């Protein structure tokens, strides 16, 4: 009998997107009006299958006769998931005298990933800008080829989770235990063995029918400038972004038989500014030389971790800092630990500081 093993793996992704838009524009006197309405439909499906076998009589057929392997060691598994996203959107643009610009946008998105009462999210946004270089008093300065001020505010949504997170899910993964592949389901249920040798499988998913869209509110202020016949361009941007109802996996007490579940809680803030300078240093007929300088400073901070979580936060005895460990609680005993701490950047490292290296045996005792 041969010790050869054979594996066959197949994965298929299918994605269908349909978008329909209607546009309108009209100019009269110093006014310009534009409008757009649209509809989008997206369908996604994933499927995979995996076969493995060993203990063949010989290797002549390769993986073309998987059934010839030892039945006790054969593994057959497959996965399937699908999701849908339906969106409607509208935008209105208005410009007066080619100086003052206004944009208003609204969109509604419905995702199959969320619960019955939270499938839809509604996200408005707006922006205004002023082309100051078109004003007579700016033109008299003979300095700017372009001087534009921008201000915007908007709310956007995130559905970045796998399908079925709102449902109760049992795990069917097989584990190799005492010489055979076994499947275990649900907390408190043993599979294939008894007593202390039994396999205990943490439930694949705790249902949360209240899962909803994660939302981000952001404002931006910017200035665009151009000099020397637009050979030098300078762009300044300042932004503040706050994300609430974070979609994340919350740690649960291991004594519950579960490890984590998807929830909406907490808030983080990102803010900063960016400066970009583009210059055309040489512009000849046969060659040119351009340069770009970029400087940015960005900061993020955890503002809160949700009222339901904060009551069970860990606390640093020395500093009083409240925090939650990122990932499975059991992992903190054997790997680097990231934490979510109120007032700190997201996923900061947290652990002991080194006091030195032990050089002799007595030092380590």
What are these regions (language model features)?
Residues 3-332, 337-340:
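Extracellular/periplasmic, surface-exposed regions of secreted and cell-surface proteins
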Residues 324, 338, 347-361:
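A detector of mature, structured extracytoplasmic domains
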Residues 343:
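Extended ligand-binding clefts on enzyme/binding-domain cores
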């Amino acid at each position: 009998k041969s010790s050869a093993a054979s594996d066959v793996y197949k994965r298929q992704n299918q994605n269908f997107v349909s978008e329909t838009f209607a546009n309108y524009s009209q100019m009269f006197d110093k006014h310009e009006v534009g409008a757009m309405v649209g509809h989008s439909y997206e369908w996604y499906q994933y499927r995979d299958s995996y076969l493995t076998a060993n203990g063949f009589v010989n290797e002549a057929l390769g993986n073309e006769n998987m059934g010839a392997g030892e039945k006790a060691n054969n593994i057959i598994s497959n996965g399937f998931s699908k999701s849908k996203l339906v969106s409607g959107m509208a935008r209105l643009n208005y410009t007066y005298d080619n100086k003052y610009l206004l944009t208003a946008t609204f969109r509604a998105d419905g995702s199959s990933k969320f619960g019955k009462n939270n499938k839809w999210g509604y996200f408005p946004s707006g922006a205004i800008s002023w082309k100051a270089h078109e004003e007579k008093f700016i033109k008299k300065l003979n300095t700017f080829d372009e001087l534009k001020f921008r201000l915007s505010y908007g709310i956007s949504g995130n559905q970045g989770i796998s399908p079925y997170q709102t449902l109760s899910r049992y795990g069917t993964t097989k584990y190799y235990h005492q010489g055979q592949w076994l499947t275990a389901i649900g907390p408190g249920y043993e599979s294939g063995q008894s007593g202390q040798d039994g396999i205990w499988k943490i439930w694949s998913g705790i249902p949360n029918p209240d899962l909803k869209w994660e939302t981000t509110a952001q404002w931006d202020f910017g200035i665009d400038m151009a000099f020397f016949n637009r050979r030098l361009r300078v762009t300044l941007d300042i932004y503040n972004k706050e994300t609430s109802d974070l979609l994340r996996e919350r740690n649960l007490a291991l004594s519950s038989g579960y490890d984590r579940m998807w929830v909406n809680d907490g808030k983080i803030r990102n803010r900063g500014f960016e400066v970009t300078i583009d210059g055309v240093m040489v512009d000849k007929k046969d060659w040119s030389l351009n340069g770009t300088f970029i400087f940015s400073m960005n900061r993020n901070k955890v503002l809160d971790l949700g009222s339901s979580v904060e009551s069970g936060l860990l606390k640093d005895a020395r500093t009083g800092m409240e925090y939650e460990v990122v990932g499975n609680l059991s992992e903190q005993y054997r790997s680097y630990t990231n934490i979510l701490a109120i007032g700190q950047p997201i996923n900061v490292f947290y652990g002991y500081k080194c006091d030195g290296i032990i050089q002799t045996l007595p030092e380590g005792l």
